[in-house]
Curated annotation (Swiss-Prot):
It catalyses: GTP + H2O = GDP + phosphate + H(+). May be acetylated, giving rise to the alpha3-tubulin isoform found specifically in amoeba and flagellates. Undergoes a tyrosination/detyrosination cycle, the cyclic removal and re-addition of a C-terminal tyrosine residue by the enzymes tubulin tyrosine carboxypeptidase (TTCP) and tubulin tyrosine ligase (TTL), respectively. This is Tubulin alpha-1A chain. GTP binds at residues 11, 71, 140, 144-145, 179, 206, 228. It comes from the Eukaryota. The gene is ALTA. Residues 430-450 are annotated as: Disordered. SMART domains: Tubulin (SM00864), Tubulin_C (SM00865). Its EC number is 3.6.5.-. Its cofactor is Mg(2+). PANTHER family: TUBULIN (PTHR11588). One of its GO terms (molecular function) is GTP binding. It comes from Physarum polycephalum. It holds the Pfam family Tubulin_C.
Length: 450
């Protein structure tokens, strides 16, 4: 079996996690108490969904997940919510004291008291796996727990499970909407460690997802639940091929192989289609060609950055539902002819496709319409550098005056860490610039000879 362990850190990670597990349970027909009426082979661990759930002798399905937060309120909602019987109580780990939006508290003072307990729980989950494939880590980089404790845990996972892939779903600060004043500090410090300790990072940003909810689903005032359910669809599409059988399955390590040209250039942009409300769905065809075109629309990107300002290096299309390879090939051929979608000249093919026959499931009473087919795109584009340069600019404005820095230094950080992290990000922006630059200078000499 190729098991995957999910780790949900802090408020953002926990709430996205709730939406994901709610959706997984619906997709597999698992009830909130963990029973699965359709699963006849009790305790027989070879079904595809066992990558995400372990089965007890009593036929209960337990998610291979850990929820961690430095303060209890958010995880207490899981402990008392609909799915309280689904999780083993040991999988929900909380501290007593908040990280207070402070990276240093999450990473040094408070984080280090709880990190060994967390790794111990992860170790227990890993011991139940026959062939652990890797980790999915969910957190935000703007808060204190997600950024500080998230980085700490990723660093420790690298030490303990060096070769296992770590895929990271990180909520980045939005351009306009801010939840904390010190977001730029936390994000820069956290990205510094994401660069080193994750294999692929998927960027999400609340503002972009708000806009999609407003525009495509006609929700006037989207709540975090609306946002998280949309994100859950994306994550579910990524992991469908691990949990169901399909025509063109995609393994976790395949994402890395196909999307990451250089180790540092591993920040992906996600988009999903069709995002459509039930009223509209009746009047639209939503063919494979249509949904393929819409995942390339800048307005459908889940992070605020415009892919037209950059070039694509690689792109992964995960289809699910009623889709055949012939339609996919035709749609991709059309995309390749479009002038607006530019690839770097050193990556001529650039598309990885996956197809899974399990149609998308929707949460009853949710906003999305039930559709026959959907596609999720993960793309590696040089435009994502916009996200970093935006955060870096805000960081510089604050750091020039050393504003708020004493809170971090007081928790045992050194000022040098700020400048080190900032330099690392400056180097990352430069890397993106160079990757997108025309490679014609290098190839200039050879062409004259032929």
């Amino acid at each position: 079996m190729r098991e995957v362990i999910s780790i949900h850190i802090g408020q953002a990670g926990t709430q996205v996690g709730n939406a994901c597990w709610e959706l997984y349970c619906l997709e597999h027909g698992i009830q909130p108490d963990g029973q699965m009426p359709s699963d006849k082979s009790v305790g027989y661990g070879d079904d595809a969904f066992n990558t995400f759930f372990s089965e007890t002798g009593a036929g209960k399905h337990v998610p291979r997940a850990v929820f961690l937060d430095l303060e209890p309120t958010v995880i207490d909602e899981v402990r008392t919510g609909t799915y309280r019987q689904l999780f083993h109580p040991e999988q929900l780990i909380t501290g007593k004291e908040d990280a207070a939006n402070n990276y240093a508290r999450g990473h040094y003072t408070i984080g280090k008291e709880i990190v060994d307990l967390c790794l111990d729980r992860v170790r227990k989950l890993a011991d139940q796996c026959t062939g652990l494939q890797g980790f999915l880590v969910f957190h935000s980089v703007g808060g204190g727990t997600g950024s500080g404790f998230g980085s700490l845990l990723l660093e420790r996972l690298s030490v303990d499970y060096g070769k296992k892939s770590k895929l990271d779903f990180c909520v980045y600060p939005s351009p306009q909407v801010s939840t904390a004043v010190v977001e730029p500090y936390n994000s820069v410090l956290s990205t510094h460690s994401l660069l080193e300790h994750t294999d692929v990072a998927f960027m999400l940003d609340n503002e972009a997802i708000y806009d999609i909810c407003k525009r495509a689903l006609d929700i006037d005032r989207p709540t975090y639940t609306n946002l998280n359910r949309l994100v859950a669809q994306v994550i579910s599409s990524l992991t469908t091929s691990l949990r169901f059988d399909g025509a063109l399955n995609v393994d976790i390590t395949e994402f890395q192989t196909n999307l990451v040209p250089y180790p540092r250039i591993h920040f992906m942009l996600c988009s999903y289609a069709p995002v459509i409300s039930a009223e509209k769905a009746y009047h639209e065809q939503l063919t494979v060609a249509e949904i393929t075109n819409s995942v390339f629309e800048p307005a459908n990107m889940m992070a605020k950055c415009d892919p037209r300002h950059g070039k694509y290096m690689a792109c992964c299309l995960m289809y699910r539902g009623d889709v055949v390879p012939k339609d996919v090939n035709a749609s991709v051929a059309v995309i390749k002819t479009k002038r607006t979608i530019q690839f770097v000249d050193w990556c001529p093919t650039g598309f990885k496709c996956g197809i899974n026959y399990q149609p998308p499931t929707v949460v009853p009473g949710g906003d999305l319409a039930k559709v026959q087919r959907a596609v999720c795109m993960l793309s590696n584009t040089t435009a994502i550098a916009e996200v970093f340069s935006r955060i870096d600019h805000k960081f510089d404005l604050m750091y020039a005056k050393r504003a708020f820095v004493h809170w971090y230094v007081g928790e045992g950080m050194e000022e040098g860490e700020f400048s080190e992290a900032r330099e690392d990000l400056a180097a990352l922006e430069k890397d993106y610039e160079e990757v997108g630059a025309e490679s014609s200078e290098a190839g200039g000499d050879e062409e004259g000879e032929y």
